[in-house]
């Protein structure tokens, strides 16, 4: 919920590519026949290489567009508040856990083009290891404020390609969930689509929860209720709170350091200006700079037509988190180093206040790493999935 930071201040009333041309080689009158043939050969090689590059980029753009279109099609024709993606399990990772008090950190810094390919076949799980031997091969993805299950379309595709089961949830009033956002009065009401799924899990079955942004507070709430059904919890540029703390409390700590957020915030007063706001929206013209400063333009366009308001009441609610329940679930934090919505300093503050088992860092990732760094994020999720039970 990049827009959680919008709560920092008191409420207010209501390229184009240039055509590729061949270099023209000037041949003097004294040039030999072999020199002319060599220049012509080099021009043909350059032209062929340029055509291949163009075809690759065109195919890449078409691949992303088709994936986004598929998500929108499911939104319009599917039912319910979540998008299940099941596949038979056939591989797993090996790994070991680290001690909680050591706060190990890991960085992702591979070289890449400006746009990540959507699918890379079995880059990380092709080691002849069975997914069935993992503690769980089921990821449950929980979006942040204003987002919906649609934002995970790249992550869903990559995880499913590697044989994982994936459930992407629309929280109440988000994505294709039809509840009126202005009528949501509590965190329990907002996260009900998530708690419903966990409640229905068979005895002994566990999942890996991934919460982005305000989704961090949502998975924390679920961890307190269903600790035995959660193998691991991943906080992705997310609100990771302590007992008795609200999301507003945490994000208000850095209230004076985000002018862009203050400019973007729009408070909604369904019950009149004399009452507290019912929801928060964002200025669409500022979305790219605030949330998607490293993301492809196609994904910014998808978000601009898909994002919805976030309910205000859940942001104010203080969490009750116990060591016996919430504290028993293994936690991991993924920092986004180019984040303009939840700056790294605030992410570090949350980490220091409630240290997780391990911290990962996504270089070059904005507040939407599922758009800006999908492959690097995928690699980290697989690494976390392979960590052996404690």
Curated annotation (Swiss-Prot):
SUPFAM superfamilies per the UniProt record, alphabetical: alpha/beta-Hydrolases
GO molecular function, one term: hydrolase activity
InterPro entries per the UniProt record, alphabetical: AB_hydrolase_1, AB_hydrolase_fold, MES/HNL
Domain of life: Eukaryota
Transit peptide segment: 1-46
Pfam families given in the database record: Abhydrolase_1
Domain AB hydrolase-1 span(s) in chain numbering: 137-241
Polar residues bias: start-end ranges: 94-104
Enzyme's top EC category: hydrolase
Biased composition (Low complexity): 25-48, 105-114
E.C. no: 3.1.1.-
Disulfide pairings: none
Subcellular location: Plastid, Chloroplast
Protein name: Putative methylesterase 11, chloroplastic
Classification of source organism: Eukaryota, Viridiplantae, Streptophyta, Embryophyta, Tracheophyta
């Amino acid at each position: 919920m990049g827009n959680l930071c919008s709560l920092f201040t008191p409420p207010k009333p209501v390229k184009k590519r240039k055509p590729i041309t061949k270099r023209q080689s000037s041949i003097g009158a004294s040039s030999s026949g072999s020199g002319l043939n060599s220049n012509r050969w080099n021009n043909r090689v350059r032209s062929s290489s340029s055509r291949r590059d163009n075809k690759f980029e065109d195919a890449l753009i078409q691949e992303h567009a088709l994936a986004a279109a598929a998500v929108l099609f499911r939104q319009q024709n599917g039912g319910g508040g979540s998008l299940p993606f099941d596949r038979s399990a056939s591989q797993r990772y090996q790994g070991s856990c680290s001690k909680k008090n050591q706060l190990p950190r890991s960085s992702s810094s591979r070289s890449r083009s400006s746009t990540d390919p959507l699918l890379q076949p079995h880059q990380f799980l092709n080691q002849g290891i069975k997914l069935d031997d993992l503690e769980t091969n089921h990821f449950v993805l929980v979006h942040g404020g204003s987002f919906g299950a649609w934002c995970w379309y790249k992550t869903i595709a990559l995880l499913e390609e590697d044989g994982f089961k994936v459930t992407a949830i629309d929280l109440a009033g988000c994505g294709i969930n039809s509840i009126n956002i202005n009528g949501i009065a509590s965190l329990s009401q907002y996260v009900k689509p998530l708690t419903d799924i966990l409640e229905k899990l068979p005895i002994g079955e566990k999942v890996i929860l991934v919460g982005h942004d305000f989704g961090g507070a949502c998975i924390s709430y679920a961890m307190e209720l269903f600790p035995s059904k959660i193998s691991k919890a991943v906080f992705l540029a997310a609100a990771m709170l302590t007992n008795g703390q609200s999301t507003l409390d945490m994000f208000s700590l850095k209230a004076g350091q985000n002018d862009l957020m203050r400019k973007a915030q729009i408070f909604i007063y369904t019950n009149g200006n004399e009452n507290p706001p019912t929801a928060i929206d964002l200025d669409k013209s500022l979305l790219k700079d605030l949330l998607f400063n490293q993301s492809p333009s196609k994904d910014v366009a998808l978000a601009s037509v898909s994002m919805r308001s976030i309910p205000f009441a859940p942001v104010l609610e203080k969490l009750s988190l116990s060591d016996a329940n919430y504290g028993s679930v293994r936690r991991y934090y993924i920092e986004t180093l180019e984040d303009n919505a939840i700056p790294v300093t605030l992410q570090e503050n949350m980490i220091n206040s409630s240290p997780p088992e391990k911290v990962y860092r996504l270089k070059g990732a904005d507040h939407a790493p599922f758009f800006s760094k999908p492959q690097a994020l995928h690699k980290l999720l697989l690494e976390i999935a392979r960590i052996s039970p404690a």
